[in-house]
From Swiss-Prot:
This is Uridylate kinase. Keywords: Allosteric enzyme, ATP-binding, Cytoplasm, Kinase, Nucleotide-binding, Pyrimidine biosynthesis, Transferase. SUPFAM superfamilies: Carbamate kinase-like. GO terms for molecular function: ATP binding; UMP kinase activity. It is an enzyme of class 2 (transferase). The gene is pyrH. The keyword ATP-binding applies. GO terms for cellular component: cytoplasm. Pathway: Pyrimidine metabolism; CTP biosynthesis via de novo pathway; UDP from UMP (UMPK route): step 1/1. It comes from Dehalococcoides mccartyi (strain CBDB1). It comes from the Bacteria. UMP binds at G54, D74, T135, G136, N137, P138, Y139, M140, T141, T142.
Amino acid sequence: MAEIKYKRILLKLSGEAFKGATGYGIDIPTVRNIAQEIKHICLMGVEVAIVVGGGNIWRGATAAKEGIDRVSADYAGMLATIINAITLQDALEREGIVTRTQSALSVQQVAEPYIRRRAVRHLEKGRVVIFAGGTGNPYMTTDTAAALRAIEIEASVLLMAKNKVDGVYTADPQKHPEATLFQHLTYMEAINKRLQVMDATALSLCLDNKLPIIVFDLQSSESLVSAISGQPIGTLISSES
């Protein structure tokens, strides 16, 4: 069994991770596969917290461009993340992994309110904690929510799971086949090069709190195990040059 380098992690799952090959919405077999990957590292003793996006159902920024009030559009996006969180929680519990969903919005029928100390206690007891509802504030992305929650729970690393992209490239590898993969970037390099790893607010939070980020392809075999073991995978973003 691989040795664990990161004992407590924050895994950021984009909404795109839930849609599989369907192109929209939630693909249940895909969610089950994600749950099985998470189960694997839980059984290794890793404390796992997750932030989910909602772009497979709703994109607030896109809706705002179509004329919908930005604040309303962003709140709709937060609700989309709750749908994804509930689905993932069910998949994890079917795998025998005790899971709690905490929401930044008040939806007490389906999720606990976000309380930092309670979240940490869940993690210490070996439960997976899914954070839904973003930060609870409009104009804030789920990437920012991931950075914020990771810092609050004192995670060792922020794992940014991507679909079909195995790290950060000099350009979009799907549009530019000649693009090359960065194995390591400093926070400032990621910000200054505008590589769209995550939004500037999220990157700045990681920079200020020296939270390392690993960008990797979730669909790659045992990629989560490699990431938590400190094996070379994807792109590492940290303060070290």
